[in-house]
């Protein structure tokens, strides 16, 4: 396999791994989205993980837990293909004479690949969020109708509403998730805590990576969700928030610091399993294809 083929395969495997993880984590992603928009501008009690799930299933049916799955898969096929594959490509530029890459270089590689992927594919995330946020039926009949309706009502630029916080979140997520997995895994192996680069070390490393990513991204993820889901006037201007900073400030003022972490548990419960499944699949696909592990 040539180096060019190897790079292409890494991009492909990155997207496929994240698509598999999206199927597993979509129900929690729906719950997380509902948590984040719950109580905007009003005083409200927390839905609660169990109560929230029961309420959604009771009112909308169990299929509601898979709202937004199609755009989610499309997003993973585009965004995650770019961020997962791009991480290795960018990281290679930072390899030292000993064949090693330091943590800062890994974080930089993650931030750049995540930001690039999110900026290009932001429309798919916008559609996913709006579908998952709707409790009165899906806002759009299909992905194609969603694209057409958004363009008709909000213009082409409407597809990139929330691109700022989306890109910020993606940069933070990829900068914390992939590098932490990469670094923790090699620390465990180098110190002999686990001696074989196999399933056990992949699970342990991805659990820590998922927790770190959840803590890092929860506030900006909430801001992204609220901006994307808010109503807009005829000129495409948000009726609740003017910018990411405005959303951050209003949320903090009305709901406190805990408001910025609204939906943290479902976010963690989503990112955790998503991260575990992603890296198990990604490492397995690389192994059977003869590509060096992360």
UniProtKB/Swiss-Prot annotation:
TM helices/strands, residue ranges: 11-31, 68-88, 107-127, 162-182, 193-213, 268-285
Predominant localisation class: mitochondrion
GO cellular component: mitochondrial inner membrane
Intervals holding Solcar repeats: 9-93, 101-187, 197-288
Pfam annotation, one family: Mito_carr
Residue numbers on the Mitochondrial intermembrane membrane side: 1-10, 89-106, 183-192, 286-294
Annotated GO MF terms: transmembrane transporter activity
Residues in the Mitochondrial matrix compartment per record: 32-67, 128-161, 214-267
Membrane topology: Multi-pass membrane protein
InterPro entries for this protein: Mit_carrier, Mito_Metabolite_Transporter, Mitochondrial_sb/sol_carrier, Mt_carrier_dom_sf
Gene Ontology biological-process entries: response to cadmium ion
Keywords for this protein: Membrane, Mitochondrion, Mitochondrion inner membrane, Repeat, Transmembrane, Transmembrane helix, Transport
Subcellular location, record wording: Mitochondrion inner membrane
Family: Belongs to the mitochondrial carrier (TC 2.A.29) family.
Annotated function: Mitochondrial solute carriers shuttle metabolites, nucleotides, and cofactors through the mitochondrial inner membrane.
Protein's UniProt name: Mitochondrial substrate carrier family protein ucpB
Organism: Dictyostelium discoideum (Social amoeba)
Lineage: Eukaryota, Amoebozoa, Evosea, Eumycetozoa, Dictyostelia
